[in-house]
Amino acid sequence: MIDVNKFESMQIGLASPDKIRSWSYGEVKKPETINYRTLKPEKDGLFDERIFGPTKDWECACGKYKRIRYKGIVCDRCGVEVTRSKVRRERMGHIELAAPVTHIWYFKGIPSRMGLVLDMSPRALEEIIYFASYVVIESGNTPLEKKQLLSEREYREKKAQYGNEFEAAMGAEAIKRLLNNVDLEKEARDLKETLKDASGQKRTRAVRRLDIIEAFVTSGNEPAWMVMDAIPVIPPDLRPMVQLEGGRFATSDLNDLYRRVINRNNRLKRLLDLNAPGIIVQNEKRMLQEAVDALIDNGRRGRPVAGPGNRPLKSLSHMLKGKQGRFRQNLLGKRVDYSGRSVIDVGPFLKMNQMGLPRQMALELFKPFIMKELVKRELASNIKNAKRKIEHADDDVWGVLEDVIKEHPVLLNRAPTLHRLGIQAFEPVLVSGKAMRLHPLACEAYNADFDGDQMAIHVPLSDEAQAEARLLMLAAHHILAPKDGKPVVTPSQDMVIGNYYLTTEEIGREGEGMIFKDLNEAQKAYQSGYVHLHSRVGIQVSSMPDKPFTDDQKQAVLVTTVGKAIFNNILPGKFPYLNEPTNDNLIAGTPDKYFLKPGEDIHQFLDAQEIIPPFKKGFLADIIAEVYKQYHVTATSLLLDRMKDLGYNISTKSGLTVGVADITGLKEKPAIIAEAHKQVNTISKQFRRGLITDDERYERVIGVWNDAKDQIQQKLIESFNADNPIFMMSDSGARGNISNFTQLAGMRGLMAAPNGKIMELPILSNFREGLSVLEMFISTHGARKGMTDTALKTANSGYLTRRLVDVAQDVIVREKDCGTDRGLRIHAIMEGNEVIEPLYDRILGRYTMKTVFDPETHDEIVGNNVLIDEDLAHKIVDAGVTEVTIRSAFTCNTKHGVCEHCYGRNMATGDEVEVGEAVGTVAAQSIGEPGTQLTMRNFHTGGVAGDDITQGLPRVQEIVESRNPKGRAEISEVTGTVELIEENPAERTKEVTVKGETDTRTYTLPLTARMAVSEGDFIHRGAALNIGSIDPKQLIQVRDVLSTENYLLREVQKVYRMQGVEIGDKHVEIMIRQMLRKVRVMDPGDTDVLPGTLMDIADFKDENYKTLIAGGIPATSRPVILGITKAALETNSFLSAASFQETTRVLTDAAIRGKNDPLIGLKENVIIGKIIPAGTGMPVYRHIKPKEVGNVADGVYSISDLEKQMQEQDASK
């Protein structure tokens, strides 16, 4: 076997008949499969051992030669070579056809490749191939035209008239002769001449033909090879036949299809030998053609051949296509051994980097390791004995198992794996029971809960795999989410409520005003019942020497609560003492107002002081982010574990319960509802008098009820008791929100009807009072719609992710700096007066392109080509800078990827991105993963103008597929002033006139359009005239590529930020760059490119560079925006495209062009089984030998620590 890692590239082409015969180990002459009595393959049949190899290892068919010592001998009795039986997976046979047959892919595809080469319509071809018409091959001296079609009757008449002067034929033979007669070089020359003055349809057809003919010329494929004289028979183990219990056989559909071909072929041979009448032979040839069509692509033409139960048979094409096809089922995703799956349960006793593995599972998963160790320790005499011990679960085994799993990480995966955090590594800890235990903080990344979820476990076997799992995939590393760089492991539910309860303050609790010398004393007093967790007390600051207090503060007494003191004890030593949930306290240190000056009375101090709110979920996340920034991975993991333990501990002690008494009624409710009824009556009266339209009435009624619900909600919030458990849950961020409470204690409000419209009839009751039958019935619809929406959304979002990954999978960080001189000018993204994405978020973690100056003092804040970290970003924003020019993926010059500087910081680690990072895949996952959180609806802006604004998931799809947007905005094609907006009620339109410097344009808009400009405004080219979505295809024609890219980026960010989902700009930039990487050639100049060709920008530049060097005229082109599906299919890798969609079309085209797949992306390498060119698979890293490093102790998780150790070792040598 060739070593797949030595492949440079992979090429596909058409197979000539000789090539097919050279692959073959023998001709299959009979349709027999296996003998039903002896179960041995039949001679010359589809499973013949002489052709395909022996069915048993090292054993010929008749049994004369057995054992490996006869390797390579061909048996003189049965003719079978003695070799391994697995050759039956690779040896092919062939069928010698009695008449040529066309290949359906090349005749039927759109456009028909045969039709283009022969310049004939697919309809004419079909008539010839299936023996309905004759075609003139040589016209001789007759008035007939070459390639003219003749019906049976016409043919007989012409034959009688001209005799053998002309030649006509039918079937694939005729097509083959015509194809052989095509002079490709001459055709190409003629077509180039035609192109010089052709236009319209004629030109399009000529370009298409020239494209195919040039493809044949350059690839060295012969057009006649589209017609086959012999067809290959795939190896028998790829189309197996197995015996079921009860003596029946199950076989692959391919065997049936091959049998039909062989039967018809043999019958045709016999008829030809018998010199049968032409019409019978013709019919048999047609049937042979149809049988071969069915074998290659059943159902492409005519009715599909059906098997038992009228099920269409699966042909060779179907074996490749779709989710169950070879590409997606077996090449891109395989089932692996050393894996298991089980239900998950919570493991609060685990550390961040651990998971609980049931003993039975561990025994099976680590079986070979245990066997080896048992033999090594002489607890078993041999491997067989060791295996028996494991199967009987001997006592010796458990001790060995403990040692074997020590420091051997395992991977856990939960489906659906929406982003890279769906697979993480943990160290196993043995647990009893049958459920795997998952660390509660890892739930958020996996989106797991413990209501019956299952997870899969995989064991990395090789040393390299284990090292990679430990250093790169350990759960303790994955603290930040790759999509936005915010912590993804934040305490939730019980942990939040515990820490919330712990940091709560109450006035007048027992022991208030006591002063302690240190935390220990305070804790003892709490345990003995002298003070409460919520009591406000004083603690000597001098007892906390590590904390960053100011010199003045160190002499004072800190006024805090016992709970807060306990909470602060889990934070890293030098971290500020947190006494209030504010950013100031987090970053600048504890405010002075919480310190008792010497001699001051603590009780008076407390009387004057306000209650400080407890620490909520968001603040806990801020703490984690800050600790991560200052202390990195290890300290953060420790803090998280402590926060988890403390949270669970205190939430148990808090004794939080929920009873019906916690839901209190609202006495103002009847009055609010009565007022609403009154308003609704007034509105109805106005409608009856004809003062308002029905639409307006509807809108106003809905408004009234929404106001009523909001009033009730507001009153509820005001009447809340701070120690109400339900309030505590929602306030702390542990579970639920205010609207849940409104439904329990206020009113449920308006519901949507099945058609999606909101019903005017509100539900006035709440769940505490109980709903009436009608109210209950109305509300059930909403519940059902919620479920179906979620299911649809999941499917749509998953498909979106798949397309995104496919288009960006080859974007990898390939170099340090591409040296571009272009940058992206950015400012905050605004929608009206609302900030969608602030400048701080957009510049953080990016490189500057130009120096940033202070707008007031003109001092330099940041030089150029500097990475902007949090401090610099704050500096820039605080100085009042509104626009920064940064390095961006849009302007990166790196071929097939991006460079470190244009990408900036890796959001998942907070450090600079490294060469080899697969940023394209991460970007696709970051955009796709939150897809399930986006809404599915199209919002109606309502009112008279029933404009639909697409939002949520449909809008994202609309943008990335560059479809014509709904609610499209007209854009101005000139820069100038809006002179006039006049309405024309008769035609229900508005005319907008824009006067530019050179010309004036008038645009017609619908009367209901809401204007984005007003008279006298100065606008730029590409500005929207009315409110709506701009069509990017139109924008790219009017403006430049960068403006279009910027617009798309803004639009995507708007959708996500409106729904409260934060995604880093760089992810969106990478996706949009992939949509705009092609250009369409307008004028080829002196290059070899055809006009109208789609080319990669990089290839286009190379082509022009070569032409310029040779002194020719370069080609001109215009940028093209492709939707992601189209962009993924237009990639340079045919393997990647074929495994994505439209498999047969992609392969047909690639074969004719003799395409070469350079194996640049991830997918194509996975398909052929080569190491992927990302991470340690990059060519740069391929030849580094791993160093021997001792055992990595529990505390060391980070790569940088290891690198330091290695450098120190090197230095000491």
Curated annotation (Swiss-Prot):
Cofactor binding note: Binds 1 Mg(2+) ion per subunit. Binds 2 Zn(2+) ions per subunit.
Reported EC number(s) for this entry are: 2.7.7.6
User: Record's InterPro entries?
Assistant: DNA-dir_RpoC_beta_prime (IPR045867), DNA-dir_RpoC_beta_prime_bact (IPR012754), RNA_pol_asu (IPR000722), RNA_pol_N (IPR006592), RNA_pol_Rpb1_1 (IPR007080), RNA_pol_Rpb1_3 (IPR007066), RNA_pol_Rpb1_3_sf (IPR042102), RNA_pol_Rpb1_4 (IPR007083)
Identify the GO cellular component terms for this protein. Answer: DNA-directed RNA polymerase complex
Q: Which SUPFAM superfamilies match?
A: beta and beta-prime subunits of DNA dependent RNA-polymerase
Instruction: List the Gene Ontology MF annotations in alphabetical order.
Output: DNA binding; DNA-directed RNA polymerase activity; magnesium ion binding; zinc ion binding
Q: Which UniProt key words apply to this protein?
A: DNA-directed RNA polymerase, Magnesium, Metal-binding, Nucleotidyltransferase, Transcription, Transferase, Zinc
Binding-site list for Mg(2+): 449, 451, 453
Q: What are the names of the required cofactors?
A: Mg(2+); Zn(2+)
Q: Which GO terms describe its biological process?
A: DNA-templated transcription
Q: Which reaction does it catalyse?
A: RNA(n) + a ribonucleoside 5'-triphosphate = RNA(n+1) + diphosphate
For the keyword Zinc, the answer is yes
SMART domains, A to Z: RPOLA_N (SM00663)
UniProt-annotated binding residues for Zn(2+) 1: 60, 62, 75, 78
Say if the entry is tagged with keyword Metal-binding. yes
Q: What does the entry list as the binding residues for Zn(2+) 2?
A: 818, 892, 899, 902
Q: What class of enzyme is it?
A: transferase
Specify one Pfam family.
Answer: RNA_pol_Rpb1_3
Q: What does this protein do?
A: DNA-dependent RNA polymerase catalyzes the transcription of DNA into RNA using the four ribonucleoside triphosphates as substrates.
Assembly and oligomerization: The RNAP catalytic core consists of 2 alpha, 1 beta, 1 beta' and 1 omega subunit. When a sigma factor is associated with the core the holoenzyme is formed, which can initiate transcription.
Q: What NCBIfam families is this protein classified in?
A: rpoC_TIGR
**Family listed:** Belongs to the RNA polymerase beta' chain family.
Tell me what this protein is called.
Answer: DNA-directed RNA polymerase subunit beta'
Organism annotation: Lactiplantibacillus plantarum (strain ATCC BAA-793 / NCIMB 8826 / WCFS1)
Gene of this entry: rpoC
